[in-house]
């Protein structure tokens, strides 16, 4: 059978696939075996060895030690009786020397040596799920029946019934391939290396002080574990790092092979001072990574080695008492324990000696080991599967658009963005942002007054205050350079498309050009007026922040800009007594112009605002026609309503006549008034008319000492409005935006009860009046 000079010679990383399909080369393998081990290495009858080992299971544990040598190979007899006697004498001398050591005596007195029990012989290391797992059957059971390989650190399978309780010797093994040299074992026989069920623990001194290395096969466990639901193949074992297989190559009941150098290193460590050797140094001692010390008392071991094993988490499981019968449930997925991870990270890479292998086997083994090392270096470099999985996923999810810009380009973009924030007047250059935060501050102040909760601190962007350098842009000029564009090429570019030229009259072109130019001028005026409006709205903030001596100048500047806004709206030219309405109507035909007028009205004086209202009332039918699509005129109702409360009765009457298109003289009005009809069919016009009637009635009732002429004009206007409201159909009448509350008394003075009810129905004032 095969022999190995030391523990490191066991080829643990051989691949099962590398040994298949080599039946044609049996003769070459036999020749290499003879050259390596000698011609008589496989001459013994291994079937008889099987039978002797099977008979040992029924004998007492006391007789096991006596029959162990008979169950081994015939090479054990080569030691001789004198060598065995010498080993016994040396072991007794070591035991006597140890008992004379006071440190060991204290350890023995405090904690006696545990006696091995039949049921808990191997429980110190091999029974816990958090410690190393059970060894499994031969790795190469078909080709090399004499070699046993440890099971990689896997969780212990829970008991699953009577089938697992049966002994390994009672199971029928599958038929194996027949070798011309070794032969085929019987089907019912136990594998080579299977120990008895109970075996005595060899003494520690006999393991260390053995005269020469003793080759012992590691025995089989009582039953097979089932890691991860299935057994690992040799291919999977080869993919496991070699350092992880160094946890326990032999059970605690079988001593490993210790070379003289290893024994010297082990005995030399006993002379060290306590604490001089770290767990990592202890794990690097060759041949000491197994379990030969597991069967010894932990206190005795600590005293012998000189307390060179501090109680670390990675080593506490090796030298502690046997764990409980019911280990705690594992909350983590099955995998190597913390002590195995320590050994994996601290122990050196285990490279078995492959000099006895066939050259073809050695080449295949080296190739597989190189592939495994490169794979583990790429995927398991940090030692954590979860972190590698996450890092691999992060690598797959990498942004394809990352690192497309250089740092210089990123800084350039950042500088451009910061240039937009560098301003001497942030309120003017960043108007919307500043207004947005002003609204937020007002809301927070209102919440503070109401006391609805703690004040919320809002982060506000602080713009850097730097001087803004104004410079005129000058295009780059290349004097005398080739390829310079000529003026004719710029003014008259080459025609790329043949456009169809339509003949148009000069009058049409002139008229269209005038309309286009007029609209452009109106848009320019609106933009200029809007800039003045923003400045005027900003004067309130500037007035509060200015000093006392600066405020008069600010007020004069504000008045000047308000007058400029009014002139832009009315289009008053220098030396012109009364401006025309055409300019204002053009502004009111544009949606932005109508909204601008609604914002300007509160800043104008009463006379200026009244002029704007009069102009709007005169041209209201045309403005209603232009506003059919936008419907922006209702935004003017609120500022007009506020203005009416500052106008006298005469102005109200004149405004009503302008709105109804009545002549200023007392002539008899026409029976039909299309101007007033258009006003009543629009919700803005009807709402403005009702507000004017309500305000005029209040003024007439509050001042009875009015002139008769003015009173007659008011009565005439009221009769005209009432007649037109009664004449227009209800379907054509628009729904007003707002309804005054004093219209009942207003109409009751000029119509009877029947007409009053009809007016109430049309204007939908029933609920408001009653």
UniProtKB/Swiss-Prot annotation:
Impact reported for residue 90 to A: Loss of nuclear export
Tissue specificity of this protein: Ubiquitous.
Which positions carry Omega-N-methylarginine?
385
Changing residue 534 to S has the effect of:
In mut2; Abolishes interaction with the decapping machinery and localization to P-body
Q: Where is this region: Region A?
A: 1-84
Q: Where is this region: Region C?
A: 449-770
Database matches in InterPro entries: Pat1-like, PAT1_dom
Which residue ranges does the UniProt annotation give for the motif Nuclear export signal? 86-95
Which residue ranges does the record annotate as region Involved in nuclear speckle localization? 398-770
Bias type Pro residues, positions: 324-337
Q: Which Pfam families match?
A: PAT1 (PF09770)
Its function, per the record, reads: RNA-binding protein involved in deadenylation-dependent decapping of mRNAs, leading to the degradation of mRNAs. Acts as a scaffold protein that connects deadenylation and decapping machinery. Required for cytoplasmic mRNA processing body (P-body) assembly.
Subunit comment for this entry?
Interacts (via region A) with DDX6/RCK. Interacts (via region H and region C) with LSM1 and LSM4. Interacts (via region N) with DCP1A, DCP2, EDC3, EDC4 and XRN1. Interacts with the CCR4-NOT complex. Interacts with the Lsm-containing SMN-Sm protein complex. Interacts with EIF4ENIF1/4E-T.
Q: What is this protein called?
A: Protein PAT1 homolog 1
Per the record, the gene is PATL1
